[in-house]
Amino acid sequence: MKMSDEALKIIEESQNREKLKQVIDLIEERLVEHAIVPTELQWTILINHLNEMLKRSQRKETIPVVDRDLFKEVSKEAITISDEIVRSIGNLTDDEIYVLSIHFET
């Protein structure tokens, strides 16, 4: 996947660089499986989001509770990918699954 200089900078400056790279690799595999091809901008936004998720996981912080009804139109595939990513990061609430899922909608 082609990444912007900004995305590469986020990765390079991440306090969780190795874990971030692992999560990105996992996402790349899932995107290929589901024929999802993000733009450079979408990748940059996603990588920034993942970096923030890793920080929250490490600091044991949570996001505000989300209304899951707002995500009822999100595909099962997007939710499944998100669930796997949230579980692989660990120490995050299920609300993260729904917020992350929008990155995988086509």
Place the predicted regions along the sequence by residue.
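A cross-family "folded-core" feature that marks the main globular domain of proteins
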Residues: M1-T106
